[in-house]
Amino acid sequence: MVDTLGLPTVFFTHSAADLQWPELARLICPDDPDSSTSRSKALMENPAIADWFFYHRIHKFIDIFYKGVLGASDYWMRFEWQHRGSPHVHGLAWLEDAPNVETIFSATSDREANTPNATHDPSGSEDSTLHAAKQQLIEYINRTVSTINPAVLPDGSNVADAPLPKTNPHICTKPYSEVVDYHHDLADLIATCQRHTRCSAAYCLRTHNGVQKCRFGYPKPLQPQTAVLMGDNLNSDEDKEPVIITARNDGLLNSFNPVQLSAWRANVDMQYCVSRHKVIKYVAKYATKSEPRSLPLREVYTKPEG
């Protein structure tokens, strides 16, 4: 797939707000769609309908957002289900107008190999071309992927005063058609769906050398502006592949596209792809990953008769 289509542009994740989405509530409990108790009960009794709804929603979203807004020429995705049955999807999208990352990095590597003592001064003609290409890439990334919290100052100094999650009523119960103030709505969605605020040993905390750390790397260091780091500029000897670090003013914020989040109205993720090796490794992992059997079903089959 990667050999045929080339390096995909973005990696994406979409989760379900199946207890909040009003469209699903009207489908599975039309008599009382505003009751959280009725929604929860109907969801447990109609898991197949909820799964169909998610499947239909993401395919429509692919057509309207990824193909229509971002100009995707192709995509790949893989569905997963949590133990309680709530689905999410991981995927890749190839965007037609995206800068060719591999060409830029290859040209930079060739330049450094041929001129090991180069200072990378953009005043030279060849360096100027590479500098312009990298700048074009950075501008495209800034339009496509964000780790900026609009409710926080650029330097992140007031992040402690960021809005709290909006859960009563939950922000995801409001359909996009009823949004009056886009920026205020986006800030509420970010606060509720995109901030990694609940680290726990059961979920993400791992102990290494006696120190507990989040396996997702939160809180992440702040970044004043988006940067493209080549292999030789990285501290790790294990990974010399290029890395893109997006501008960040909130160390707990998961990456997203503002239009993606506003329209989907549940937790999302979007990251820019820079490594063919990592993409192939990722696809192989998720394409061959099996779903764990549910504990109740296993108990039913193993329970002695009588």
What positions do the PLM features span?
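Intrinsic low-complexity, intrinsically disordered terminal tails and linker regions enriched
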Residues: 1-89, 93-306
